[in-house]
Amino acid sequence: RGELMHKFGMLFQGGALFDSLPVWENVAFGPIQSDGVNRAKARQIALGKLAAVGLGPEVATLRPSELSGGMQKRVSLARAIAREPEIIFFDEPTTGLDPIMADVINDLIVKSVKGLGATAVSITHDMASARKIADRIAMLYGGKIIWQGPAKDVDRSGNEFVDQFIHGRAEGPIRMELRKL
């Protein structure tokens, strides 16, 4: 099981950082808990991964609650790549971020995935993010994949569901039920 888990990294939508631990221990959680890495080596791994996401060593001793949302997201990314996984799952990686920080996170995701030679699977409603980080896009509706193809083709998918979604139109085949008061 440990060998299998070593192959996966995860960036959770809400960050899922432990407020009781300093940033470096959050980043090094996997190496310490699952790989048995000693604390000194784990701290070095954490500092390296923090640097990879644009955070300096001064952040390492802070608690997650002392960080901005964008910094927390970068710490979460550092944790996701700390074990150098083969596959990284991203759950709404840009949710709650302003457009500039979202673009920074997207750039860091692309850089991290390429640097590791990893496969990335992202779940997102943010089409700017999907276009930037994806090679391929699949759209789910009603529990089924209704379109899939290269990211560059999503704007001309020919699929009315995809077209409605990417353009954010209320009219179309996707119906949003509104409760009446």
What are these regions (language model features)?
Residues 84:
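Conserved catalytic motifs of ABC-family nucleotide-binding domains
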Residues 88-91:
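Catalytic Walker B motif of ABC-type/P-loop ATPase nucleotide-binding domains
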Residues 103-116:
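Helical segment within the ABC ATPase nucleotide-binding domain
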Residues 63-67, 71:
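Conserved ABC ATPase signature
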Residues 21-29:
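Short coil-to-helix segment of the ABC ATPase nucleotide-binding domain corresponding to the Q-loop/switch region
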